[in-house]
C-alpha cells in the first residue's frame, strides 16, 4: 500500500472536521445562546446573522463522514458501533435544529421552535464532545472489530469534553454576534464572550491535565524529551491568544475576538493531532491499519479534489457577499 495515500486522506478528513467545527460551531453557538436573548427581536437578529451560511457549513460534516467511510472503512466499522447512541443523538438534534431554524421564521408562535432550536443545538454539541472524549480515552478493539459495550462512551471524561465543547461553541457564537450584530445583541454577546472565554480556558486546562494523567501514551508524547522542547509553544501560544482575546473584548474590537476564538480551536485541534497521530482509533488502529485499498482511495480522491475547489469557492463567495454587520430589518429568508 502506498504509504502516502492514507496520510493524504487523513489530511482531507482532518481539514473537513476542523472546517466543520469552526464554521458550524458558531451556528450551534447561536443556538446555545438562544435562551439568553431577551425577546423575539433579539432572536431574529441572531438568526439573521447566520441565515446565509448555516446550511452550507454542514457540508463539511458530510465530507468528513463520507471520507471516513470511503478511505478508512475499518475505522468507520469500529467507530460507529462504539458511538451509535451519541451519533444518533447528534444527527436527530441537527435535524430538529434545522427544522426549527426554518419554521420559526414563518410560524406565528415561535416559542416551540425557539426551544427546539436551542435544545437541538445544545444536544448536537454535547454529542460531538462526547464522541471526541470517547475517542481520546480510547476504543477497545479486538481482531480489528469493536469489542466494547454500547455505553462505554458514557464516562465522566467524555461528558466533561461535551460540556467543554458547549462552552467552546458558545464562545464562537458570542464572538460571531459581536462581529456581525449591533445594539443590545452585540453588547450581551460581548459579556457572554468574556464569561465563556473563562469557561473555555478552564475546560482546556481540565482536559489537558486529565488526558495525560489517564492516558500514559499521551503523557509520553507530550512530556518525554526531546518532545517537550518542541511542543511547549502550543500551550504557551494558546495562553497568549486567550489573553489577547480578553484585551480585544475589553477594547470593544469587533472582528479580532472571533478570529482569536478560531485560533484557540485550531490550537486545540493541533493538540489533538499531536496527541493521537497516526492513530485514527486510539490506542490501537492507525491510518494505515484501517485504510481502504489504494485503488478506492485514488478514485475517491480524484472526485474529492474536483469538487472541493467548487465547495470552497461557493463558501468564500457567500461569506464575501454577506460580509459586514446585520442591520435591523434586513432578512435573508
State the predicted function of each range:
Residues 28-53, 69-79, 102-111, 174-192, ...:
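Juxtamembrane membrane-water interface segments of multi-pass membrane proteins
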Residues 258-266:
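Central hydrophobic cores of alpha-helical transmembrane segments
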Residues 103-253:
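Long, contiguous internal "core" modules enriched in hydrophobic/ aromatic residues
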Residues 1-13, 67-83, 136-156:
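Helix-coil boundary and interhelical linker segments in multi-pass alpha-helical membrane proteins
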Residues 9-20, 81-92, 118-122, 152-166, ...:
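Alpha-helical transmembrane segments
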Residues 1-56, 62-65:
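N-terminal signal-anchor module of multipass membrane proteins
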Residues 281-300:
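Short, membrane-exposed interhelical loops at transmembrane-helix boundaries
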Residues 53-123, 142, 221-229:
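Membrane-interface helix-loop-helix modules in multi-pass inner-membrane proteins
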Amino acid at each position: 500500500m502506498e504509504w502516502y495515500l492514507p496520510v493524504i486522506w487523513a489530511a482531507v478528513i482532518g481539514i473537513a472536521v476542523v472546517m466543520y467545527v469552526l464554521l458550524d460551531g458558531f451556528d450551534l453557538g447561536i443556538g446555545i445562546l438562544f435562551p439568553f436573548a431577551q425577546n423575539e427581536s433579539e432572536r431574529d437578529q441572531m438568526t439573521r446573522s447566520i441565515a446565509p451560511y448555516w446550511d452550507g457549513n454542514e457540508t463539511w460534516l458530510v465530507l468528513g463522514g463520507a471520507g471516513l467511510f470511503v478511505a478508512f472503512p475499518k475505522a468507520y466499522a469500529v467507530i460507529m458501533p462504539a458511538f451509535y447512541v451519541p451519533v444518533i443523538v447528534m444527527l436527530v438534534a441537527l435535524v430538529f435544529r434545522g427544522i426549527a431554524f426554518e419554521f420559526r421564521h414563518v410560524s406565528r408562535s415561535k416559542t416551540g421552535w425557539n426551544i427546539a432550536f436551542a435544545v437541538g443545538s445544545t444536544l448536537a454539541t454535547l454529542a460531538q464532545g462526547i464522541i471526541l472524549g470517547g475517542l481520546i480515552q480510547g476504543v477497545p478493539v479486538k481482531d480489528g472489530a469493536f469489542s466494547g459495550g454500547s455505553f462505554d462512551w458514557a464516562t465522566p471524561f467524555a461528558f466533561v469534553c461535551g460540556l467543554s465543547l458547549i462552552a467552546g461553541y458558545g464562545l464562537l457564537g458570542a464572538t460571531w454576534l459581536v462581529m456581525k450584530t449591533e445594539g443590545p445583541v452585540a453588547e450581551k454577546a460581548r459579556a457572554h464572550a468574556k464569561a465563556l472565554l473563562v469557561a473555555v480556558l478552564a475546560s482546556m486546562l481540565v482536559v489537558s491535565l486529565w488526558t495525560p494523567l489517564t492516558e500514559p501514551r499521551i503523557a509520553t508524547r507530550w512530556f518525554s524529551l526531546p518532545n517537550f522542547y518542541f511542543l511547549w509553544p502550543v500551550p504557551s501560544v494558546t495562553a497568549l491568544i486567550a489573553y489577547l482575546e480578553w484585551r480585544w473584548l475589553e477594547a470593544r474590537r469587533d472582528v479580532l475576538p472571533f478570529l482569536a476564538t478560531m485560533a484557540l480551536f485550531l490550537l486545540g485541534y493541533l493538540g489533538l493531532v499531536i496527541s493521537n497521530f497516526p492513530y485514527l482509533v486510539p490506542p490501537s488502529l492507525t491510518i494505515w491499519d484501517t485504510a481502504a485499498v489504494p485503488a478506492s482511495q485514488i478514485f475517491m480522491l480524484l472526485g474529492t479534489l474536483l469538487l472541493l475547489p467548487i465547495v470552497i469557492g461557493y463558501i468564500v463567495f457567500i461569506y464575501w457577499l454577506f460580509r459586514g454587520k446585520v442591520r435591523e430589518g434586513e432578512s435573508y429568508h
